[in-house]
Amino acid sequence: FGHPHRRFATIHVAGTNGKGSCSHTLAAILQASGLKVGLFTSPHLVDFRERIRVNGKMVSEKYVIDFVEEHRSFFEPLHPSFFELTTAMAFKYFAEQEVDVAVVEVGLGGRLDCTNIISPELAIITNISFDHTQFLGDTLAKIATEKAGVIKPETPVIIGEYTEETRPVFESKAMQENAPITFAQDDKEILTATPNTGQGFDYETKDFGRLHGELGGYYQERNANTVLCACRQLISMGIIKDHDCIKKGFANVTETTGLRGRWERIQTSPTVIC
């Protein structure tokens, strides 16, 4: 495919929980700043095409069908996994759509994940807990080692949350790669979080004023803090130009990026939450 992943900037998002919320919020912010944004996430909730979006719009059914049919003879001898095939499709689609930047969510782990072929502008590791232990290891330190594989030479990395077991792993890998590292847990951007009239929270922040957060769930405060630390880095890199796009992005994640199933109210009588 001619290395399509080299034709656009990327932000790589790893971690056990919060990847989807952080990825969609970052995409909403980048779109609000006027960029053409690719978004690659998994798994999908209803439709496979949710995984691959440009400015919130899902890849077309025709593109998916044509991609598989056109390249079937190439793929069949290789026996790629479902996720490897999907990743190749996403990167090719983003390149053809000429996106400015793509937010790329890791599928599993990090070090050996096929998305780790990218050389991102920024890496984010949301948190570490026990998941996929048969593949990633049976201790938090082992799991952190796999996820720390997304830390690249001289590439800034944001760590959302850490434990006494995982922090040394991240510090060691960042030092090895000469990568600037920020621990969002210690560098609080969120000062207060107050439930708002919607499903989400209004945040008083250290550097970005008052933000109306759309996403619900008590855990979104931690996700928001991670995203804001990432935004501060992206501002310093000139990728995000101002604070206004951050306000717009936080307030319009679902409409802008199509995010579903994050403490989403889908019925009121009776109340049904997805």
Give names to the regions the model predicted.
Residues 152-161:
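Short loop-to-beta-strand entry elements in the cores of soluble alpha/beta enzymes
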Residues 144-153:
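Membrane-proximal helix-turn-helix segments that form the acceptor-binding/catalytic region
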Residues 35, 155, 177-181:
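Short glycine/serine/threonine/alanine-rich loop segments
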Residues 1-45, 122-124:
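Walker A (P-loop) phosphate-binding motif
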Residues 7, 96, 101-106, 114-124, ...:
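Nucleotide phosphate-binding/pyrophosphate-handling subdomain across enzymes
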Residues 160-161, 173-195, 214-218, 247-255, ...:
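Beta-strand->loop->alpha-helix junctions that form or flank phosphate-binding loops
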Residues 3-6, 32-118, 134-136, 165:
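ATP-dependent carboxylate-amine ligase catalytic core
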Residues 43, 86-135, 167-210, 259:
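Extended acidic/charged loop-beta regions that coordinate divalent cations
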